[in-house]
Curated annotation (Swiss-Prot):
It comes from Gluconacetobacter diazotrophicus (strain ATCC 49037 / DSM 5601 / CCUG 37298 / CIP 103539 / LMG 7603 / PAl5). It comes from the Bacteria. InterPro entries: PRC_barrel-like_sf, PRC_RimM, RimM, RimM_N, RimM_N_sf, Transl_B-barrel_sf. GO terms for biological process: ribosomal small subunit biogenesis; rRNA processing. It is found in: Cytoplasm. The gene is rimM. Keywords: Chaperone, Cytoplasm, Ribosome biogenesis, rRNA processing. The PRC barrel domain binds ribosomal protein uS19. Belongs to the RimM family. Binds ribosomal protein uS19. NCBIfam families: 16S_RimM. One of its GO terms (cellular component) is ribosome. This is Ribosome maturation factor RimM. The keyword Cytoplasm applies.
Amino acid sequence: MDRERILMGVVGRPHGVRGLVRVHSYAAVPEDLTAYGALTDEHGQVWSLRWRGDGIAELRDAAGQPLSGRDAAQAMVNRRLYVARTSLPEPDQDEFYFTDLIGMDVRAQGTDAPLGRVLVVHDYGAGVSLELGGQGHAPLILPFTRACFPVVDVAAGRIEAVLPDEIEVQGDLSDKGEVEVSATGGAS
């Protein structure tokens, strides 16, 4: 796992015919994606970005050339954009970047039974979830909430999970409004 780069955005669908693309920024303020310096993708290509509207951007390659048109923009869909970890502030105590969780062992709270390793951190807009699995462990996806993960200590390399009997989602999922995920019960 490359811990020297932090995923900060993903290229979405083309916008128009002139090479503009939608960019989904993971920065707290989406426009701040341009403040962290050069962006690199999963292929090691270097990109710069200029915002042209709400979520719409012009991508330029390392030579400063913009995408040539809609076909070039279409080829960039789902391209992940990373920044150097050194460009970002160090997380405060009890804070971390999601990439720090990848590969960490997860144990059941109370029994210390291994549940697997964090394979993927999913964020589809309705809340973050962790996918656990690995050698000898069935895949398991849990909402990344304090109810399911009461202990996350990156410095100590420790994650403890409470397996819920039931997961309840409250709120309206249709308009990206506030959604609350709660876990009830739990294996102990």
